[in-house]
């Protein structure tokens, strides 16, 4: 029956957790009521959501609700806007936790990593499954720190809608812009939640205006605050002309009253609400033709008579079309406004069937899923999060991975509840699942029921099976994967002893599967292992995880900036490779030209002269492209990747019987020759910087940035603070958080994001090369 009891010590509280082994539904149901009285929970870490709550739910309703009742949503925002606190309140009010988790206390459900609870930030996106008023909500809490942008990208890829959380005193901040652009890329409908309305300096109007100006979005005001900062008491429902007031004597925010606004007691508030509602109706009518016809036809004389349900349906359509964004407000920390936010999620955000995924027509109901996250569990092995787009998943099912062209058997199927999971018999389209047994699958892989299913889908998509067609077929069936950003920092990492090197390699291999933004490579000169990451905090977290999870006390070298290289002029080179292996002669001769690319490009552009035979290219194209990309991995100056270059192959002679490996070796050597002959340029990462500082500290901050080669673009006013926007080289901003704290007595904050790579000045480049090699470089 139950395999084991585990006792968790969370914030010095004794918390029991029941782990369910595989059992049929009837056995689970028979034990639910008995367990209900036996679990002395202060927080619900039960494997089955709702298992110990007063309202014990049917396991059938928990597993597979109708698709129209599913909402796959993410919570996204700038760091410290209140994402995790909002998530914890959602969990509590939906009945899946029995006490309120707090970021400062380190006992939140979705921040389950030790580093997250210590630092009070979210590092990995945690999936949580809950029910709200008959709806299934799969909710993902994402990081707000720029070093963990990939986590945001991973979760947005599989969502149908999102809640953007804003600090009402700050409005749109730097990382908000980043995640908003990511959501735009994936065409995700959003609603906005103006959090921290109780905070000093909170301004509803300012926050709404910043959404309009900075995000270029059209806000639809669905709520008005009753008071601001210390006077914040509740919200007004503009659509229904009702006020929601929370009981000040209630500790958890569950006790609130919804009352119609009356002319007698709420004259000014009612007047303001009617104006806001009329404005909302006009906005929505401009954006939705169906609603415009209704309003102009039946209610042109009096907008007050427009039914709330008609207005809600129109707002839903406008949100789905991403023509505008509904705006709500509240204070998650003070337990106000979260229940209406959940209502808005189910009312205005789309179900999976309302999202247009054109590729689904090719599968005709067969299984199609995307792996968007991989974790490692010491007992279970790799845990793969899947978004199911069509078909049904069951345990012991053999599935085909299109990306890796392999078939694996899924041993177990789980429903995710932060770091707790319940085993289930099946899961259908629209849901997010956690699978055990997929050892080859990595982030971004497309999973189907079988290889024959993939080929059948390709035929339905009208793809031929001519030469090279198979590759195009596979590409046409792949779901858009997760775009992995290039790392900007690197450092060496050493195990405590040579004997521990295999253990370190094993740990890094697992961490890379979990986090594709972490790159690990071997330095060819020193033989050292090199970590490449997205920022100082990213590298620090990886180092800490190796110690905590794998018991390895590793040593990090100095943190260094990941530069790029390029060329400034056009150069030709030739090379011949002539080898005899056994009784076989391998002969390749090539001539190529490298030149600066007309447009910036991370990967070298490859072209072929007309004189290069098409038959020769058919057999060798893959080897040629592999050689060029390999040669560009290490530039001649710093060994950094080469970008913004183009290559033209002018001639290629291959002796009959020559292996493609020799073709690759010859082209790669020829490419390296050309790069060495060209005039070379180092490119450094340029970061966009946003510093929020009080007026009295503005001057020292600006003076310090000037010394760091900073280029100030604009200084904005945000309430009583000043916001400095500009660009600064990454090399100049390392360790900046400590400096900024010192300059401003800890009152300022800053955010960084990679903007582009820019050419270094000759003086700075020479100094860098001297520092790296200890020798003067003549370019």
From Swiss-Prot:
Q: Where does GTP bind?
A: 77-84, 141-145, 195-198
The taxonomic lineage of its organism, from the top, reads: Eukaryota, Metazoa, Chordata, Craniata, Vertebrata
Q: What else is known?
A: This protein may be expected to contain an N-terminal transit peptide but none has been predicted.
Entries under InterPro entries matching the protein: EF-G-like_DII, EFG2, EFG_II, EFG_III, EFG_III/V, EFG_V, EFG_V-like, G_TR_CS
Q: Which UniProt keywords are given for this protein, alphabetically ordered?
A: GTP-binding, Hydrolase, Mitochondrion, Nucleotide-binding, Protein biosynthesis
UniProt GO BP? mitochondrial translation; ribosome disassembly
Q: Which Gene3D superfamilies match?
A: 3.30.230.10, 3.30.70.240, Elongation Factor G (Translational Gtpase), domain 3, P-loop containing nucleotide triphosphate hydrolases, Translation factors
Origin superkingdom = Eukaryota
Q: Which residues form the tr-type G domain?
A: 68-353
Q: Which reaction does it catalyse?
A: GTP + H2O = GDP + phosphate + H(+)
Q: Which PROSITE patterns match?
A: G_TR_1 (PS00301), G_TR_2 (PS51722)
Name the chain's protein.
Ribosome-releasing factor 2, mitochondrial
The record lists the organism as Mus musculus
Q: Tell me the enzyme class.
A: hydrolase
* Protein's job: Mitochondrial GTPase that mediates the disassembly of ribosomes from messenger RNA at the termination of mitochondrial protein biosynthesis. Acts in collaboration with MRRF. GTP hydrolysis follows the ribosome disassembly and probably occurs on the ribosome large subunit. Not involved in the GTP-dependent ribosomal translocation step during translation elongation.
């Amino acid at each position: 029956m139950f395999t084991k009891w585990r006792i968790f010590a969370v914030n010095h509280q004794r918390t029991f957790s029941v782990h369910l082994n595989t059992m049929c539904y009837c056995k689970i149901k028979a034990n639910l009521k008995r367990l209900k009285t036996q679990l002395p929970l202060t927080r619900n870490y039960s494997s089955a959501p709702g298992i110990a709550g007063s309202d014990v739910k049917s396991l059938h309703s928990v597993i597979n609700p109708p698709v129209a009742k599913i909402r796959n949503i993410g919570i996204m925002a700038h760091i410290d806007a209140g994402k995790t606190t909002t998530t914890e309140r959602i969990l509590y009010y939906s009945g899946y936790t029995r006490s309120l988790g707090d970021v400062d206390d380190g006992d939140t459900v979705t921040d389950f990593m030790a580093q997250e609870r210590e630092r009070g930030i979210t590092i990995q996106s945690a999936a949580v499954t809950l029910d709200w008023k008959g709806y299934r909500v799969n909710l993902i809490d994402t990081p707000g720190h720029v070093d963990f942008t990939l986590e945001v990208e991973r979760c947005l890829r599989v969502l149908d809608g999102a809640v953007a959380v804003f600090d009402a005193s700050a409005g749109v901040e730097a990382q908000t812009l980043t995640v908003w652009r990511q959501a735009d890329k994936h065409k995700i409908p959003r609603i906005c939640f103006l959090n921290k309305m109780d905070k000093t300096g909170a301004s509803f109007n300012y926050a709404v205006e910043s959404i309009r100006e900075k995000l270029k979005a059209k806000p639809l005001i669905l709520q008005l605050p009753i008071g601001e900062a210390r006077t914040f008491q509740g919200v007004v429902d503009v659509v229904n002309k009702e006020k929601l007031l929370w009981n000040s004597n209630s500790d958890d925010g569950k006790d609130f009253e919804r009352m119609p606004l009356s002319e007698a007691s709420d004259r000014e508030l009612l007047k303001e609400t009617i104006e806001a509602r009329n404005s909302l109706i006009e906005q929505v009518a401009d954006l939705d033709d169906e609603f415009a016809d209704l309003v102009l036809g039946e209610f042109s004389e009096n907008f007050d008579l427009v039914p709330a349900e008609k207005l809600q349906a129109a707002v839903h359509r406008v949100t789905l079309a991403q023509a505008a964004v509904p705006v709500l407000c509240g204070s998650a920390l003070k337990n106000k406004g979260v229940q209406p936010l959940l209502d808005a999620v189910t009312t205005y955000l789309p179900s999976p069937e309302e999202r247009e995924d054109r590729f689904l027509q090719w599968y005709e109901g067969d299984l199609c899923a995307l792996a968007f996250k991989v974790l490692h569990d010491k007992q279970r092995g790799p845990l793969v999060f899947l978004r199911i787009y069509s078909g049904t998943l069951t345990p012991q099912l053999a599935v085909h991975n299109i990306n890796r062209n392999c078939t694996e058997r899924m041993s177990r199927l789980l429903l995710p509840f932060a770091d707790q999971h319940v085993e289930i018999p099946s899961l259908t389209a629209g849901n997010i699942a956690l699978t055990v047994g997929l050892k080859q699958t990595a982030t971004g892989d497309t999973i189907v029921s079988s290889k024959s299913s993939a080929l059948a889908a390709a035929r339905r998509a009208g793809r031929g099976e001519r030469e090279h067609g198979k590759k195009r077929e596979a590409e046409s069936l792949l779901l858009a994967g997760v775009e992995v950003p290039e790392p900007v920092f690197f450092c060496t990492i050493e195990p405590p002893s040579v004997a521990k090197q295999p253990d370190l390699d094993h740990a890094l291999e697992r961490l890379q599967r979990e986090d594709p933004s972490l790159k690990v490579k071997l330095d060819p000169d020193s033989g050292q292992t090199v970590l490449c990451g997205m920022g100082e905090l990213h590298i620090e977290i990886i180092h800490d995880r190796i110690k905590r999870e794998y018991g390895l006390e590793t040593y990090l070298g100095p943190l260094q900036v990941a530069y790029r290289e390029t060329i400034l002029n056009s150069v030709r080179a030739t090379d011949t490779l002539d080898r005899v292996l056994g009784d076989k002669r391998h002969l390749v001769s090539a001539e190529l030209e490298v030149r600066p690319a007309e447009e910036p490009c991370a990967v070298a552009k490859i072209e072929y002269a007309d004189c290069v035979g098409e038959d020769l290219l058919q057999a060798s194209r893959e080897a040629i492209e592999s050689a060029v990309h390999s040669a560009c991995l290490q530039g001649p100056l710093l060994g950094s990747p080469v970008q913004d270059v183009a290559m033209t192959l002018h001639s290629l002679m291959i002796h009959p019987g020559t292996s493609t490996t020799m073709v690759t070796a010859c082209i790669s050597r020829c490419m390296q020759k050309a790069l060495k002959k060209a005039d070379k340029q180092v490119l450094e990462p340029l970061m966009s910087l946003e510093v929020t500082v009080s007026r009295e500290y503005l001057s020292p901050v600006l003076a310090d940035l000037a010394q760091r080669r900073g280029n100030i673009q604009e200084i904005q006013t945000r309430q009583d603070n000043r916001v400095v926007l500009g660009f600064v080289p990454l090399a100049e901003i390392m360790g900046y958080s400590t400096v900024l704290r010192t300059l401003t007595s800890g009152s300022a904050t800053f955010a960084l994001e990679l903007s582009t790579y820019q050419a270094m000045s000759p003086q700075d480049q020479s100094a860098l090369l001297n520092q790296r090699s200890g020798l003067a470089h003549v370019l």
